[in-house]
Amino acid sequence: MSKNKFIKLHSKEDNSVIIARISKICLVTTDNDYSGKMTTVYFDDENIDSITVNETPEKIYQNIVELDNTDFLKLHSSDDNAVMIVNTEIISVISQSEEDGKNVTTMYFNNESIESASFNESPERIYKMMEITNNDVVTADNNETK
């Protein structure tokens, strides 16, 4: 089965249909605004930084996986444990540090509009998730492509 290149979303503003190229999605987050929670989809595109949509990050992830696209990770924000979806293609570095007595994993991105995000999952756990979902991860042990 070939990968579908697009996903259908709905604008938070007026519920209109939005068709987005999956490979251009970098990060999906849940944010709070004056009206409550909203889902923001960030793009790796010079023409658009982000959109707010009605779908939850969980639903977007489920739709992406159902379309046979495995370049995405479902992680949890270190701030509020909210689900965040990350495109592995934009990850530059993953590191861990201690903040307020808690281990926090910071992921740095190769993206102009989003520098980094922090997650609950350890770097080791994220690496294992990437090995499972991505066949082109290079292992640190032998420096060969799996």
For the regions a protein language model found, what residue spans apply to each?
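Eukaryotic intrinsically disordered, low-complexity regulatory linkers and tails enriched in Ser/Thr/Pro
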Residues: 1-146
